[in-house]
Structures are given as structure tokens and as C-alpha cells.
């Protein structure tokens, strides 16, 4: 009988040993072994059954072999990650519909404070501010480097400090900022806490390109005033000077012979340069001419003008000017050229596309007619090539008008519209809205399009990009080296050769 009891006790001891020996994976987790119970694991690891159930979100005491259990809550550790997208919006809360605090450029290293259940990460800046970004656009940082925003901010502050201490005081409260060498639209976005898209909108920029000496509105209050200044300055400097050039030489040539021919040829040069005083009334005249400039339907190009300058002057986009004036992709303008600056004055499209209707009978006639109509046979060939695009010519106006409706809408991977888009979802939606068939992702759209060179590209064609693993982005070409597309910052207009796009450009496709 005693031997029987000893056997039972011995077996019980073995059972207890089995229950108390879960497989320890790390200091914070264990893997359940056969025969384990929550009570046994709690006793072994110095915790309680309730704590185990809470940490592992268990509704009952039931566990199964192979199940991994957390036995200790791990304190969140800050890790550094790198932005893998071209641009990444930082938002007020972990949701794509929340307010944008700023935007981070690709490869920026950020500190991740914590991760949310929906995949968003809370990040922090060196100034103590925090925000949220979509975790799928972050990758492990290979080198623990300081956050790029810090470097840019210090660089900007160092430059301002070197210029003057007064500039530093005005910096945070200023409503405008004068661009210095090394500045980028993104750096200004971080410095003033304004989204890149807002800076582009407030300053009537067609892309995120800026130049040294340019005055940028960094507060919404200055956005309305900035275009007015440009409007008044442009006519004053250019238009009156042309009139002076036409009339002043006549006066100078007549006055010189009458007074002193040989004695003061050298002095006459300063006199030729003295039209500066006559230009002063022109500066004062600025106040009397803005009404004509803003209401005019056409504008005569002056020396030093560019499409970007004219677009800012009349509050339109570069794409509008190219469309209204039937400009080529090269967008070359010249002094004296008259441009339509309002849709009501848009120049009619070339009548060439109507010729194919005549050419069809010519191509179907017997071979005998071909020799006699050599000119007619060559013309349709050119016209047919020009009409291979569904979206060319008359269709582009409708296509571009539809695309512009969605400017500023947020980007969501896989979204097909109309409230949010990814790149191929945007192109498909816009094309289909105007009756042009387009579907699939960016790679499919590339495969199904007719490949053309940049010199052949017309507004309405598609433009494609490859980040290294195949076609990964598509936009709608609008001419002048620009496209309208859905990217990380939402639907916007971008320069296909600037701001990091050029190195990934693959080519153009016609649908």
C-alpha cells in the first residue's frame, strides 16, 4: 500500500514538473507545451492568470500546445526608420482624412514612438512635436542618422543667423519668405509647419520648383497679396519700357547732332541710360494699369517673360496657357507674341484633324488613282498618326477639366475614386468619366498603350515611371513637361523632370 502511494506521489511530481516547464522563447514570451495550464505558466513565470489573460486577450483559461503567450508587457522602444515614398504626409492623427501637419521627403529618417493597430506609426521630431504617418511607407533605417528635418532646419536657421539677427526674430511670424540658395519647398514646409500642397496653392505654383530670390507666402493671409504684387510689377517694368525704346532713340538721335556731335559722344551714353528717370513715372503708373491687366483676355509677350510668370500674373495655370494657345510641348514663346490668357479668348484648334474624313475615300480607291493624288495620299498618313490618341485635341479639354476637379484629393493605395485615388485609379477614373476606356494598374496601362517618345507626346497621353522593380507610377501628361497625377501628397500637378521624378521617368504611352 505504501509503495502504491509512493508511486502516485512520484507520478504527481512528474506531472507537476511537466506543467511547470513551458518552452521559454524569450524573457517576455513562452510557447505552450503539451500539458501546460495558465496556472502552471503563471506560477513558473511569477505572474497571475488574470495578467496572462489580459496581456494575451484570452476569454477563457483554455490554451493549446504551440500557442505563443506574452508573459511580460514590453515597454515601447523608439526606433529609427526611413521614408520609402517620394513624399510622405505627416498627419494630426492616425487616419488619411486627418489634417496634414507637414510632408517628409523620401529617405528622411524619423523616430517611431509607437505603432497603431491600423498600421499607422506615431513619430516625433527633435523639437518635441509629434505626428502620424502610414507605416507602409517606412522602412528600416540602415544607418542611425539624425533626422533630415533637423539638418534642414539648422541649415536654414544658420543661414538666417548669418544674414541678420532681425531675420531670425521675424522668421516664425513672417507671412512671406525670400528663397535663398539651398532652400526647397519641403524645407520651408517643415520650417513653417505648412503642408507642401498649401505652399504650392498659396503661391500659384505649377510645381514644387522654387528659385533663389523668389518671395514665397508662408501664411494663408499673404496668399492673396502675393499675386497682386506680381501683377503690378510686371506691366511696370516691361510694357512702358518698350514704348520708351521706340520713341526715345528718335529724340536722342535728333538732339545729339543739334547740340554736340564730337565733344560728348561718351556723355551721350549716360543720357541714353537716363531713360531711368522716364521709367520712374512708369513705376508710379502701376496703380492705374492693374484693372486692364487683370481683365484683359489677351497679353502680348514682353522681353524676359515666361509662361510661369504670365500664369501667375493672370491667376491661371501653365497648362491652361498651353491649351488655350495650342502651344507645343517645347513651350517656346517670344517677345511680341499675343497669348490668350482667358478661356473665352482661346485660339481655335488646328483644322488638320478634319482631313482624315477626305482621306478615307482616297485610301479605298483603286491603285490607279494613287499616282495622280500623291499629295492627298501623304496628308492622310500624317493625320491618321495624329489621331491615334483617344485623348488628343478636342478630347483633352474635357479630360483636363475632369482631372482638375480632383486636385488636392488624398492618396490611398488601391483606391479608384472619386473621393480618394492611387495613381492608376486616378487615370482610369478621369479617362472613363470623359468616355475613354482605361483600366488596370500602372503596369497594365503601360503594357496596353502605344509607346511614343517625349517629342511625340501630346497633352492627354500617359507618362510612366519605374522605381526599380517595374512600372510603378502613371500620370496624365498636360504638356510643358508637366503631369497631373495621384501621388503620396494627393492629386497634384508635378514636373516630370524635376523634384526627383526625372530619374525614374520611363516614357510615354498613348491610349
Swiss-Prot record:
Residues 393-511 form the NlpC/P60 domain. GO terms for biological process: proteolysis. Residues 78-142 form the SH3b domain. Gene3D superfamilies: endopeptidase domain like (from Nostoc punctiforme), LysM domain, SH3 Domains. Residues 1-27 form the signal peptide. Residues 28-71, 175-218, 297-341 form the LysM domain. Keywords: Hydrolase, Protease, Repeat, Signal, Thiol protease. Its EC number is 3.4.-.-. Residues 229-291, 347-390 are annotated as: Disordered. It is an enzyme of class 3 (hydrolase). SMART domains: LysM, SH3b. The active site is at residues 423, 473, 485. One of its GO terms (molecular function) is cysteine-type peptidase activity. Residues 229-257, 264-282, 347-362, 372-390 have a biased composition (Low complexity). It comes from the Bacteria. PANTHER family: MUREIN DD-ENDOPEPTIDASE MEPH-RELATED. This major extracellular protein may be involved in the invasion of non-professional phagocytic cells by Listeria. Belongs to the peptidase C40 family. This is Probable endopeptidase p60. It comes from Listeria grayi. The gene is iap.
Amino acid at each position: 500500500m505504501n509503495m502504491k502511494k509512493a508511486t502516485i506521489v512520484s507520478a504527481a511530481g512528474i506531472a507537476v514538473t511537466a506543467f511547470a516547464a513551458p518552452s521559454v522563447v524569450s524573457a517576455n514570451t513562452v510557447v505552450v507545451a503539451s500539458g501546460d495550464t495558465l496556472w502552471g505558466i503563471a506560477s513558473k513565470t511569477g505572474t497571475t492568470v488574470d495578467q496572462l489573460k489580459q496581456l494575451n486577450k484570452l476569454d477563457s483559461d483554455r490554451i493549446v500546445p504551440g500557442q505563443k503567450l506574452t508573459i511580460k508587457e514590453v515597454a515601447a522602444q523608439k526606433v529609427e526608420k526611413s521614408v520609402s515614398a517620394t513624399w510622405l504626409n505627416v498627419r494630426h492623427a492616425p487616419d488619411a482624412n486627418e489634417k496634414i501637419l507637414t510632408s517628409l521627403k523620401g529617405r528622411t529618417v524619423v523616430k517611431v514612438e509607437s505603432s497603431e493597430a491600423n498600421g499607422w506609426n506615431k513619430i516625433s521630431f527633435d523639437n518635441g512635436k509629434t505626428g502620424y504617418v502610414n507605416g507602409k511607407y517606412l522602412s528600416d533605417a540602415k544607418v542611425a542618422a539624425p533626422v533630415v528635418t533637423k539638418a534642414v532646419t539648422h541649415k536654414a536657421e544658420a543661414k538666417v543667423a548669418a544674414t541678420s539677427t532681425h531675420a531670425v526674430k521675424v522668421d516664425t511670424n513672417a507671412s512671406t519668405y525670400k528663397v535663398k540658395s539651398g532652400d526647397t519647398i519641403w524645407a520651408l514646409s517643415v520650417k513653417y509647419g505648412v503642408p507642401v500642397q498649401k505652399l504650392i496653392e498659396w503661391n500659384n505654383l505649377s510645381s514644387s520648383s522654387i528659385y533663389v530670390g523668389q518671395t514665397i507666402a508662408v501664411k494663408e493671409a499673404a496668399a492673396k497679396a502675393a499675386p497682386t504684387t506680381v501683377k503690378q510689377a510686371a506691366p511696370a517694368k516691361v510694357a512702358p519700357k518698350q514704348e520708351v525704346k521706340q520713341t526715345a532713340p528718335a529724340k536722342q538721335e535728333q538732339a545729339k547732332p543739334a547740340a554736340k556731335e564730337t565733344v560728348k559722344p561718351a556723355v551721350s551714353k549716360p543720357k541714353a541710360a537716363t531713360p531711368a528717370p522716364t521709367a520712374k513715372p512708369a513705376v508710379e503708373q502701376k496703380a492705374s494699369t492693374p484693372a486692364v491687366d487683370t481683365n484683359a483676355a489677351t497679353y502680348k509677350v514682353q522681353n524676359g517673360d515666361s509662361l510661369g510668370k504670365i500664369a501667375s500674373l493672370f491667376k491661371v495655370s501653365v497648362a491652361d496657357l498651353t491649351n488655350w494657345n495650342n502651344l507645343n510641348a517645347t513651350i517656346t514663346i517670344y517677345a511680341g507674341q499675343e497669348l490668350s490668357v482667358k478661356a473665352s479668348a482661346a485660339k481655335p484648334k488646328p483644322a488638320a484633324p478634319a482631313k482624315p474624313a477626305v482621306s478615307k475615300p482616297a485610301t479605298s480607291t483603286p491603285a490607279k488613282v494613287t499616282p495622280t493624288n500623291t499629295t492627298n495620299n501623304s496628308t492622310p498618313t500624317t493625320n491618321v498618326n495624329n489621331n491615334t490618341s483617344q485623348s488628343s485635341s478636342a478630347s483633352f479639354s474635357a479630360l483636363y477639366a475632369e482631372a482638375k476637379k480632383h486636385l488636392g484629393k488624398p492618396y490611398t493605395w488601391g483606391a479608384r475614386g472619386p473621393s480618394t485615388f492611387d495613381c492608376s485609379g486616378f487615370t482610369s477614373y478621369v479617362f472613363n468619366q470623359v468616355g475613354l476606356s482605361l483600366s488596370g494598374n500602372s503596369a497594365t496601362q503601360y503594357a496596353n498603350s502605344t509607346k511614343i517618345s517625349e517629342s511625340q507626346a501630346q497633352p492627354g497621353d500617359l507618362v510612366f515611371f519605374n522605381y526599380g522593380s517595374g512600372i510603378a507610377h502613371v500620370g496624365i501628361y498636360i504638356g510643358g513637361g508637366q503631369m497631373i497625377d495621384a501621388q503620396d501628397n494627393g492629386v497634384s500637378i508635378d514636373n516630370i523632370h524635376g523634384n526627383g521624378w526625372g530619374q525614374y521617368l520611363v516614357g510615354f504611352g498613348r491610349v
